């Protein structure tokens, strides 16, 4: 931003200045003093377990309150892009609230549509897996139906945990929507 560029808070040596001027080093047009962090990874589980006093959000009791609380909190995550980069392990966040699958599907579909229409940044990302959940299956069903660009979605695959049926559902969804991406969860947690 232009306002941040009026400040010269970084001690940049002459060699680095030349590289910046030659556009060999990219600042991503954030200015000299970005006033918001780039990557913030909120603990969304705390929101689900305790609510948020600051935003006057009670602990969610159903799928509608759970998706609504997440959508509200997403608008308050400080980020240089003005969007949250990470949306959480959305299947495990929503799984406790899947009581009626038809009702949950409607809520999850609207939740995903809202994300696609309002968090329009390619860095917006969510995870599902490695455990096969009803919420995860409903998320995949909605992603396949909506074919939304956002959020980017990754399935955390673990050959010892992830069911064959769930990973096949992920693969069939990816053939339609180019997501989820597949991550080796076991490698990530070791």
PLM segments and residue spans:
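Conserved catalytic cores of very large enzyme subunits
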Residues: 1-190
